[in-house]
UniProtKB/Swiss-Prot annotation:
Protein name: Nitrogenase iron-iron protein beta chain
Protein's organism: Azotobacter vinelandii
Keyword Transcription regulation among UniProt keywords: no
InterPro entries: ChlB/BchB/BchZ (IPR050152), Nase/OxRdtase_comp1 (IPR000510), Nase_comp1_CS (IPR000318), Nase_Fe-Fe_bsu (IPR014280)
A single BP term in Gene Ontology: nitrogen fixation
Cofactor annotation comment: Binds 1 [8Fe-7S] cluster per heterodimer.
NCBIfam families per record: anfK_nitrog (TIGR02931)
């Protein structure tokens, strides 16, 4: 038996796993303090993305649109960008960073966004807003290639390339978290804090889990500042935790400022978290404290309680963001589970060269399929027509109908998750994330078995 990597066998897409590149750029923009992105395209390119963000995080986020119409699609719509920047800066006096995010329509018609930004910098900003600090950043994210993952990767690079400067080198690291949840950022900051490591966190979205304060105010925007972004050029190392969600920025900093780039591994599970901490130790010289050794021991004890009795040999399908899917698969293997189908939902040609996928191909001793450019039909067809047997599905809420229709238990993980409450508060990374994931997988299986076995199933069946 082998691990086989293959592309989707169809040209068309049936029920996509991902949305498009501009969504990734918009997610970057809401992670920056005093930033509102302008999406140069139709209003739906913003409206539906904002809806998904709000469904997942249960917060409202500010994003703008150039409101492209039919005439702009025919004759060009650079004027819409100029008007959008003018209106945005007039209405929001605190905004300092304005990404201009392109879409499929504006890329196809060839609108010169870089030229418009140059014109605005030399004209409108000097004439109407002479005393304001305003940064206009072009982000080219056509929707007809890639996905929200590649759009995120491009946008992080563009932001870093715009701001990073070499001033006074320091002992900080750059932490490029990738597309994660507030709970993940909190867990990562906890690990760094225990090791006494300072970091420029891209992006600081812990505040998405925002309080409503006694005065009625609430904060629901990112807290990565312009100063943090500038300081990325002074760090001693850059950690891109996800290979496909931050590597472009890490490689830029390495090439421009000779800052070492450490790519991955995504710290999901005990093994990958251990590697992450060892990499931190090597890069900074800071020791791994006993407190983290204690947390590791607690996590190992929790996993030992579940692995052999409840999780071993369970057949799992996983879909979503590639780094998340691969990290979850590695974790499942450590728990003696069998991830039999991995669905990576975009057309990235680099998957075949991914060392983690190569390791799966070399080490897996049962039948595993990894499908690139996949959609949900790749999962449903295997269940419905090819007899794929599964004990568990891991993925975001968009795939819930397959779980419901075929009576297969499913743990919601990834983005977007909107049919279970509060999951964005919990980490999937670090030792805390390992405990949460393992216990949630077990509890999902327990709840399913209650409906399929007698009430004493846990004693008589497992």
């Amino acid at each position: 038996m082998t691990c086989e990597v293959k592309e989707k066998g169809r040209v068309g897409t049936i029920n996509p796993i991902f949305t498009c590149q501009p969504a990734g750029a918009q997610f970057v923009s809401i992670g920056i303090k005093d930033c509102i992105g302008i999406v140069h395209g139709g209003q739906g390119c913003v409206m539906f993305v904002r809806l998904i963000f709000s469904q997942h995080y249960k917060e409202s986020f500010e994003l703008a649109s150039s409101s492209l119409h039919e005439d702009g699609a025919v004759f060009g719509a650079c004027g819409r960008v100029e008007e959008a920047v003018d209106v945005l800066l007039s209405r929001y006096p605190d905004v300092k960073v304005v990404p201009i995010i392109t879409t499929c329509s504006t890329e196809i018609i060839g609108d010169d966004v870089d030229g418009v930004i140059k014109k605005l910098n030399e004209g409108l900003l000097k004439e109407k807003f002479p005393d304001r600090e305003v940064h206009l950043i072009a982000m080219h994210t056509p929707s007809f290639v890639g996905s929200m993952i590649s759009g995120y990767d491009v946008a992080v690079r563009d932001v870093v390339r715009h701001f990073a400067k070499r001033e006074a080198p320091n002992d900080k690291i750059n932490l490029l978290t990738g597309w994660v949840n507030p709970g993940d950022v909190k867990e990562l900051k906890h690990l760094l804090g225990e090791m006494d490591i300072e970091a420029n966190v891209l992006f600081e979205i812990e505040s998405f889990d925002s309080p409503i304060l006694p005065d009625g105010s609430a904060v629901s925007h990112g807290n990565t500042t312009i100063e943090d972004l500038i300081d990325t050029g002074n760090a001693r190392a850059t950690f891109a935790l996800n290979r496909y969600e931050g590597t472009k920025a890490a490689e830029y900093l390495q090439k421009k400022f000779e800052i070492p780039a450490i790519i991955g591994p995504t710290p999901i599970g005990i093994r990958n978290t251990d590697i992450f901490l060892q990499n931190l130790k090597k890069a900074t010289g800071k020791p791994i404290p006993q407190s983290l050794a204690h947390e590791r021991g607690v996590a190992i004890d929790a996993l030992a309680d579940l692995t052999h009795m409840f999780l071993a040999e369970k057949r799992v399908a996983i879909y979503g963001a590639p780094d998340l899917v691969i990290g979850l698969a590695e974790f499942c293997l450590d728990l003696e589970m069998k991830p039999v189908l991995l669905l990576l939902g975009d057309d990235n040609s680099k998957y075949v060269d991914d060392p983690r996928i190569k390791a799966l191909q070399e080490n897996v001793d049962y039948g595993m399929e990894i499908v690139t450019n996949a959609d949900f039909w790749e999962l449903e067809n295997r269940i419905k027509n090819e007899g794929l047997e599964l004990d568990l599905i891991l993925g975001h809420s968009k795939g819930r109908f397959i779980s419901i229709d075929y009576n297969i238990p499913m743990l919601r993980v990834g983005f977007p998750t909107y049919d279970r409450a509060g999951l964005f508060r919990y980490p999937t990374v670090g030792y805390g994330g390992a405990i949460w994931l393992a216990e949630q997988m077990a509890n999902t299986l327990f709840a399913d078995m209650e409906h399929k076995k007698n009430k004493e199933w846990v004693l008589n069946v497992w």
